């Protein structure tokens, strides 16, 4: 399989495992962006926990699913977003205003759109989950 995006492969395998009713999924290869994205998902309760396994190659991540994840995906290319444009993207990508999160990479790190709005920083959109 051709890996166009490691983050895209990660999120699609998690979404497929969730639809099949699996309790855990193994993701390889690993990257820092995937770990930060999973940390944001865990903070909001969409995944139970995850563990990084170092296999002296590219690494693996074992993610424990809790059945709350409906859909997740990557936005490619990574569009630039100002603080004022975040509201428009949430309307495009998420089913409701109170439901789901857009993950941004900013100068202050990888965070969800609500935290970016509070810190008044823009950035590039990585993906979404709800």
From Swiss-Prot:
Cellular component terms (Gene Ontology): ribonucleoprotein complex; ribosome
Keyword set, alphabetical order: Ribonucleoprotein, Ribosomal protein
InterPro entries assigned: Ribosomal_uS8, Ribosomal_uS8_CS, Ribosomal_uS8_sf
Gene Ontology biological process terms from the UniProt entry: translation
Entry's Gene Ontology molecular function annotations: structural constituent of ribosome
A Pfam family the protein falls into: Ribosomal_S8
Keyword Coiled coil carried by entry: no
Family statement: Belongs to the universal ribosomal protein uS8 family.
Protein name from the UniProt record: Small ribosomal subunit protein uS8y
């Amino acid at each position: 399989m051709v890996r166009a995006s490691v983050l895209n492969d990660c999120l699609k395998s998690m979404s497929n495992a969730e639809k099949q009713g699996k309790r855990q999924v193994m993701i390889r290869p690993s990257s820092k962006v995937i770990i930060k994205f999973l940390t944001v998902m865990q903070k909001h309760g969409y995944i139970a926990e995850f563990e990084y396994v170092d296999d002296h190659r590219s690494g693996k991540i074992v993610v424990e699913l809790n059945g709350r994840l409906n859909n997740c995906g990557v936005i490619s290319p990574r569009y630039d977003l100002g603080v004022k444009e975040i509201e428009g993207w949430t309307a495009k990508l998420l089913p409701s205003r109170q439901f789901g999160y857009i993950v941004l990479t900013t100068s202050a790190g990888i965070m969800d759109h609500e935290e970016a709005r509070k810190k008044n920083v823009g950035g590039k959109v990585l993906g979404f989950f709800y």
